[in-house]
Curated annotation (Swiss-Prot):
E.C. code: 2.5.1.145
Full protein name: Phosphatidylglycerol--prolipoprotein diacylglyceryl transferase 2
Keywords tagged on the record: Cell membrane, Membrane, Plasmid, Transferase, Transmembrane, Transmembrane helix
Functional pathway: Protein modification; lipoprotein biosynthesis (diacylglyceryl transfer)
Membrane-protein topology: Multi-pass membrane protein
A GO BP annotation: lipoprotein biosynthetic process
Subcellular location: Cell membrane
PANTHER family in the record: PHOSPHATIDYLGLYCEROL--PROLIPOPROTEIN DIACYLGLYCERYL TRANSFERASE, PROLIPOPROTEIN DIACYLGLYCERYL TRANSFERASE
Amino acid sequence: MNLLSIQPLNRIAIQFGPLTVYWYGIIIGIGILLGLILATREGKKLQVPSNTFTDLVLYALPISILSARIYYVLFEWAYYKNHLNEIFAIWNGGIAIHGGLIGAIVTTIVFTKKRNISFWKLADIAAPSLILGQAIGRWGNFMNQEAHGGPVSRTFLESLRLPDIIINQMYINGSYYHPTFLYESIWNIIGFVTLLILRKGSLKRGEIFLSYLIWYSIGRFFVEGLRTDSLMLTSSLRMAQVMSISLIIISLLLMIYRRRKGLATTRYNELNNNALE
């Protein structure tokens, strides 16, 4: 293998004069669109008005992107304070999922209160869409050659039976790296299937969404330990791992609390439109 012949994939998908469209944005857009279609179809089965998720996305998407970028920039302020012109260059990557999740949850809480709809009902319906979108979105990191792990040998990557297109894209500045984007994407796809199975069971309202938070956080905690570009809370604490542990604990406590207080009595697929549950 002639290492000098390995060239990264072109991050630019389309270019019309000054207009540049990056694969990163296209891939994120595909994830959002598929998630919206999935949530809308499931919502119809549970008597949620057809325009509800479209309206929610129109509010939540820009706020989530903004909060995800702010979250990232704050933890990388040592760099961005000297590169202010790059703060809004999200096509180069650098949006934090946990920041986006915070923005999405806050927006959905406000949205459901104004529409007099159960937050937990919408969150449960959206949970598979969220994790599917995250699984797809990680391939944007692949195109940007970011969110990778530490150095490994080509032999190691070949032992994973990965196609050359992935192995070669993991060749960055003279070294091969762990394709952590792929590990997390696979974990999220398994989580997507798991959530589809769980929602056919006896879980109460809100518990599909909380299960999503737990599942995603478990995978993210371990994958984050392999990454080399983690946002750091301190010199030894990775912010994503702290957030993951926090979300697992909070989600478990919420499940227990809601059941004990009688706040979770409706099963996921019951046609109960009580906005308080």
